[in-house]
Amino acid sequence: NSALERLVDAYTSSAVHLLMQRDMDAVAEAGRSPPASSPPRPLPKLRRSRSGSATELLQYVHAPLHVATRPSGWTQFRILSVRTWSNLVRNPMLMMAHMLLACVLGAVCGLLFHQLTNDIAGFQNRFGLFFFTLLTFGFSCLSLLTTFAEEREVFARERANRYYAATPYFASKALFDVLPLRVVPPFLFGSIVYALVGLTPTLAAFWRMILVLVLFTLASSACVFCIGVGIAHTSVASMVSTLTMLASLLFAGLLVNREQLPPAVRWLQHLSFFHAALEALVVNELRGLSLRERKYGVDIEIPAATIISSFGFDAQAFWIPDVLTLVLHTLAFSALALGFLTWPVSYTHLRAHETSLH
């Protein structure tokens, strides 16, 4: 005989097996006994074996049935937040890369656009600085696609088993994954570049610039996350995200003048978060600036608001509609992503339930 067969034979002839068999027979007999009129015959008291397996089994069978209740939304959010933060800490290179990129780009832009002048060249350099900044932070949000792609199977399995709802998961991802990587880098970049470039030297203008950069990054992140959740294939989601960014960039206002657009497509600028952010940054910096240019021995002074208007921007727009547009884009894409997180898993769970019934 093999070692496994000898082990089985030894267990079959052991006292532990005999006690276990007797306990199981007693439990089965108690289940078949008639209810109501006479109370069920109590099970015989068994001598506790050395392993204690038989007695522990009986205690488990006679113990009150505890039905596990689903934890509250706050408990789900707290547990998922701890897990999300732990995953972020275990992979510090991603956070360090975002922080280092923001600092390096801030230093490079500070050197390239050092102490801008109040002339036409300085006006052009300000436009270039803001456009490059939005381009950098917008396309850096594409890294969100791989973040959710790595968790898609785990999320689908856990949601199908009803471990947690979609809202706590989305909130934990937004608070402990999106915010550290999308809020801190714009603040670092803006803090470095603002003084080096020589932008408007007021505290209010500085914080307005930081606000616009943060809101733009959040809107871009929400857009990319929404596409990543809605499209299962990472390569397709990456292509759609890139095309969406380019389309929004096309209507930003620098590549195509709004006044030269056909009326049928002019409304598309209102769907461009690049346009809202660029217009807000330009208005915040240049609205009260006067440009002085000396050409052919003649000094010319031009209000920057006039040139802003010639580019198709609204010199009075900042809070409304630009900042409001960024907030609405963030909320709309977040709500759509939450809907994508909820609907497919619920549908899969429903189909699995119907299959099990049949």
What are these regions (language model features)?
Residues 117-129, 154-162, 241-244, 266-269, ...:
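Interhelical loop segments of eukaryotic multi-pass membrane proteins
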Residues 141-162, 166-167:
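Transmembrane helix boundary and interhelical loop/hinge segments in multi-pass membrane proteins
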Residues 66-67, 135-141, 205-209:
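Short alpha-helical transmembrane interface motifs in multi-pass membrane proteins
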Residues 85-86, 119-133, 201-211, 304-325:
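Juxtamembrane membrane-interface segments at transmembrane-helix boundaries in membrane proteins
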Residues 352-358:
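A short, hydrophobic C-terminal helix/tail in secreted or cell-surface proteins
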Residues 110, 166-168, 172, 176-258, ...:
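Alpha-helical transmembrane segments and their short interhelical loops
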Residues 1-90, 98-110, 114, 246, ...:
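Topological signature of polytopic alpha-helical transporters
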Residues 109, 127-147:
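Long, hydrophobic alpha-helical segments
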